[in-house]
Amino acid sequence: MLTIKQITDNTDAVIRGLEKKHFKNAKETIEQVLETNNKRRNTQTILDKNLSEVNSLSKSIGMLMKEGKKDEAETAKNRVAELKEANKALQEEMDQAATDLQNLLYTIPNVPYDSVPEGVGADDNVVEKMGGMETELPKDALPHWELAKKYDLIDFDLGVKITGAGFPVYKGKGAQLQRALINFFLDEARKSGYTEIMPPTVVNAASGYGTGQLPDKEGQMYHCEVDDLYLIPTAEVPVTNIYRDVILDEKQLPIKNCAYTQCFRREAGSYGKDVRGLNRLHEFSNVELVRIDKPEHSKESHQEMLNHVEGLLQKLELPYRILRLCGGDMSFTAALCFDFEVYSEAQKRWLEVSSVSNFDTYQANRLKCRYRTAEKKTELCHTLNGSALALPRIVAALLENNQTPEGIRIPKALVPYTGFEMID
């Protein structure tokens, strides 16, 4: 979340940034934050003054008694009792103001960087780069859901029977392809210096608040109400929360973690042709990169992550493009985000396969994730993460773009992992 210092020192800039993200009632909300913070500070000032007076009077009572000034001592005792009673009410008032302030800050998104373009939605995102060759497919090319059925790779109907829509069952070479991609992505991450983590796929509410999914995405997360636990939307949540309430040594940075997990999203309200097959699922596999770094290095770290994801797509021989997201299409927590999309020749559309984001200090402030400098000062870290990669649409693009009359060709980089060159 935003720090009070950010808001008080740069009020107008914060409001403009929130308006770039199309956050409703930005000015009114920030004014409410400032008002609540002033109330908390004023109450604290009165409480501190009262506590100081109590300490002073308490010291004087003994001396007054020694000097035989019993009436004055009694007056001082009565005043101390009055102040202590008043302080109880002041403490409750200050605690309530602090709670109100915290809850209010939880509802405010991160402020985008100046380099984020203006815009309302996906149509306003800026194409930064395109790469790979678009595949020329035969006129009778099939979408991936038809290919999955033809080669008995994925059974969507069986998933509906077992669980419901959006929970496919991978079979035979379909399951092998899925596992091959996971191992390929993890190996590539390790080669780039990432340490693999195998985290839980359920988290508590504190973890959800730490990375910013709560309260913003409450309705989009699967909630196990009996135990008050949430299924994770990506490994970002458990892996980043490893560093909640932690003060790191400057020498430990940057921290580079990767994790493969199953991910769960309710995707409430999603329907139509864009959600067919693997295009949008409730459960999917993903390899996530998480980095924690010093503020002055996070821009470079972000670029390294972008280069890593681009390298994966190049090795998979997929046509891709990189988008700089506009303010209105960015996530609640991101300060800067780039999306990677691969082209589906069979569907004639672009499919998102990764978002790589810099969160500045927004998550670190929620998490209280800090580092100690050489000068023994503690500073908030910068956090970054991105998918490298999300599997469903990668699988969809691989099946569609590599279909031939003989079968589906496997990219050379994957053959050592699949053990076969063709699905036929």
Q: Can you annotate each of these PLM segments?
A:
Residues 27, 129-424:
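TRNA-recognition modules of translation machinery and tRNA-sensing kinases, especially anticodon-binding
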Residues 1-135, 153, 157:
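N-terminal alpha-helical targeting/anchoring segments
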